[in-house]
């Protein structure tokens, strides 16, 4: 998958195979397979086809990648849809752990989510983790769409999500997640490119103001 970051994901148009790499790969594989099975029929998630000790194979889901739609001028629709979908996730008492348009596929006509991907970091936790990370993705990879972030938060609230935390709380959650990923990459390849990338991203995020 062109937008994958930490794992190897390949598909043939019928099935998608995700191979887990890096620290705690087995734990992340078990987490993702468990949540995909648990959430099937409750949220738009791919159907599990096969699980091996190193990979999860799911059925292919046709749809447009969220980041591609942002680049194609559909940021308002995509961010609103992200907000609605996230409220549904949080109603189940879970946190996705890597939430945002980078892990979503959308119907190209209605712009409704057809698949929420990459559940390997899912866990019980506070909503601010997902709210702040979706915002971080936009601020980092699509800064031109930062003015449209209110569409995301407003849709989340309209769909029944709790009150959106303050900028200070969201910023603190972003920094915490960046530190987690810095630690992850440092353990995976000490002194490598991933560690440098996340150190730079942590520094950049630290300098942000509302």
Give the positions of each predicted feature.
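Conserved short submotifs of the Hanks-type protein kinase catalytic core
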Residues: 53-65
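ATP/Mg2+ or Mg2+-diphosphate-binding catalytic cores
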Residues: 147, 181-210
């Amino acid at each position: 998958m062109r937008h994958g970051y930490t794992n190897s994901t390949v598909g043939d148009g019928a099935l998608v195979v995700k191979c887990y790499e890096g620290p705690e790969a087995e734990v992340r594989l078990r987490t993702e397979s468990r949540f995909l099975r648990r959430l099937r029929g409750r949220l738009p998630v791919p159907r599990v086809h096969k699980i091996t000790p190193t990979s999860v194979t799911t059925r292919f889901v046709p749809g447009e990648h969220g980041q591609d739609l942002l680049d194609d001028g559909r940021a308002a629709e995509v961010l609103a849809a992200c907000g609605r979908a996230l409220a549904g996730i949080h109603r189940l008492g879970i946190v996705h752990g890597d939430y945002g348009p980078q892990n979503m596929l959308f119907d190209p006509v209605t712009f409704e989510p057809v698949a929420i991907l990459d559940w390997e970091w899912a866990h019980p936790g506070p909503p601010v983790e997902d709210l702040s990370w979706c915002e971080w993705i936009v601020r980092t990879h699509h800064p031109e769409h930062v003015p449209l972030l209110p569409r995301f938060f407003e849709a989340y609230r309209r769909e029944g999500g709790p009150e959106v935390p303050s900028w200070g709380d969201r910023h603190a959650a972003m920094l915490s997640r960046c530190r987690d990923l810095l630690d992850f990459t440092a353990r995976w390849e000490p002194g490598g490119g991933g560690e440098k990338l996340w150190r730079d991203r942590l520094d950049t995020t630290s300098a942000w103001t509302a």
